[in-house]
From Swiss-Prot:
GO terms for biological process: cobalamin biosynthetic process. Pfam families: CobD_Cbib. Pathway: Cofactor biosynthesis; adenosylcobalamin biosynthesis. It comes from Listeria innocua serovar 6a (strain ATCC BAA-680 / CLIP 11262). It is found in: Cell membrane. The keyword Ubl conjugation does not apply. It is a multi-pass membrane protein. It comes from the Bacteria. The chain crosses the membrane at residues 54-74, 78-98, 152-172, 203-223, 295-315. This is Cobalamin biosynthesis protein CobD. The gene is cobD. One of its GO terms (cellular component) is plasma membrane. The keyword Transmembrane applies. Converts cobyric acid to cobinamide by the addition of aminopropanol on the F carboxylic group. GO terms for molecular function: ABC-type vitamin B12 transporter activity; threonine-phosphate decarboxylase activity.
């Protein structure tokens, strides 16, 4: 029965994405993180913020697991149909495939209209770097990098944990990922309180990131992109990122499309020097955004089919 629930969750994400007006657990988790972070900052200062960051991680992930388990448990006690609906909905909310594609297409359309200022604002909604001075090509690159990275932590990783431990484990993973996106920065403000969250996010994404590289390589062959180079660049440039995971999917996409990603960016006014990923020399345009979206969908479907096949064999 769980296989049917997983399938419906995946199809719902494929069709609907994440409508902004719908209630969403990740929004609740984000609000909880913000409130708890503010409270902990009033109590802890200096180096003790490292300890506070540990509390932040344990309380956020722990509460996410407990609350989601209780919701499923109570719904099961009331009626099976309610349990099924809650299971499917919670699983669906952990996936970000179509939402990610929609955001990328918005930026693509704005660039096509020649509205650079609006495109800078839009890309600033999905990346952590400063975007107010980006060129059209830099905006395209930032969009592609985000889609590539989030193919791993927005789709493949939630699917991975969903098939292992159902919506509870998938939501706990999303809590880890949300913590990293909110406090896992290396600047002065977040270095201490976000240290534990950043390290745990690296750990949680260790396997999914490498699986994402593999699925993106397969997708590259299916779409008749450069699959061999996707394989090679993903391995060659796997360490060309401050994260131990991000270069795997970004390298696969860069190799598949024959482009170069990464490099130096500004974050909160500070210049962060990063190595490049890929060795392509062609200019990056809106066309490559479309190709990256195709890779996102194809790799996600491949991952789902492989995970569901393994689940059927084992269970």
């Amino acid at each position: 029965m769980s296989v049917l629930f997983y399938t419906i969750s995946f199809i719902l994400d494929f069709i609907l994405g994440d409508p902004y007006s719908w209630p969403h657990p990740i929004k609740v988790i984000g609000n909880f993180i913000q409130l708890l972070t503010n409270a902990l900052r009033k109590i802890f200062h200096g180096k003790s913020l490292y300890f506070a960051g540990g509390l932040l991680f344990i309380l956020t992930v722990g509460m996410t697991g407990i609350v989601s388990w209780l919701i499923l448990y109570i719904s099961a006690k009331i009626a099976f149909w309610l349990y099924a609906a809650v299971f499917i909905y919670l699983g669906y909310t952990t996936l970000a495939m179509t939402c990610l594609a929609k955001e990328a297409r918005k930026i693509q359309r704005t660039l096509a209209d020649g509205d650079l200022e609006a495109a800078r604002v839009q890309v600033g909604m999905i990346v952590g770097r400063d975007t107010d001075k980006l060129t059209a090509e830099q905006i395209s690159k930032a969009t592609i990098e985000t889609v590539a990275e989030n193919t791993a932590d927005g789709v493949i990783a939630p699917l991975f944990y969903l098939f292992i431990g159902g919506p509870v484990l998938a939501l706990m993973y999303k809590a880890v990922n949300t913590l990293d996106s909110m406090v896992g920065y290396k600047n002065e403000k977040y270095r201490a309180i976000g240290f534990v969250s950043a390290k745990m996010d690296d750990l949680a994404n260790f396997i999914p990131a490498r699986l994402s590289w593999f699925f993106l390589v397969i997708a590259s062959f299916i779409l008749k992109y450069d699959g061999r180079t996707a394989w090679r660049i993903g391995l060659r440039d796997r360490k060309n990122h401050t994260s131990p995971n991000c270069a795997y999917p970004e390298g696969a996409v860069a190799g598949a499309l024959g482009i170069t990603l990464g490099g130096t960016h500004e974050y909160f006014g500070e210049t962060v020097v990063k190595p490049t990923i890929g060795s392509g020399t062609k200019a990056v345009t809106q066309k490559e955004i479309s190709q990256t979206i195709h890779l996102l969908y194809t790799a996600s479907i491949i991952a789902f089919l492989i995970f569901i096949s393994i689940h059927l064999i084992l269970f």
